[in-house]
Amino acid sequence: MEMSNAQRLILSNQYNLMSQLDPNNAAKYKRLQTIVERGYELQMRELNKDFGCLSEAECREIIDIMEMYHAMQESNNMLDAEERSKVDQRRLQFLGFDIATEAQQVHYVRFLVDSEGLYPQFDKADHHFNSQMPMLDKYRRMLQTWRNCPRQYHLCENELAQIFSA
């Protein structure tokens, strides 16, 4: 992240103020203040980690993935008890994305659920949509299979199994 000395001074002052306003995180803000003041470029890269960008297409893909899970959950609810017993109920839970490798996706899902109020039925679990393993490729395969289903919101037990194993 390229910053002028004036920008570094402003950011340093902001970190100083934050350390005073939030004593519980003062050590974190003092560390960041030191990094900015001294210009440690390797560590300054971590300041940039939260300033990502998701394109409109990437946002729509995430919404499509979440909508697919919504459709699978609703379809499961419409199955009779015998069919429902054949569906692995754990696989119906939307796990989210891997915070280590798919951080922007995790943050977008959290934004959609927490700020926008979408998909309130999704269980945040203990990890708040951090699957702790890369999921995007798996979701893309599942999405392809789901899109090929003739009735995407009235899936049968067999179609659910096909989507799970995509």
Swiss-Prot record:
Transmembrane segments: none annotated. Gene3D superfamilies: Helix hairpin bin, yfbu gene product, domain 2. Pfam families: YfbU. Coiled coil: none annotated. Belongs to the UPF0304 family. This is UPF0304 protein VP0990. It comes from Vibrio parahaemolyticus serotype O3:K6 (strain RIMD 2210633). The lineage of its organism: Bacteria, Pseudomonadati, Pseudomonadota, Gammaproteobacteria, Vibrionales.
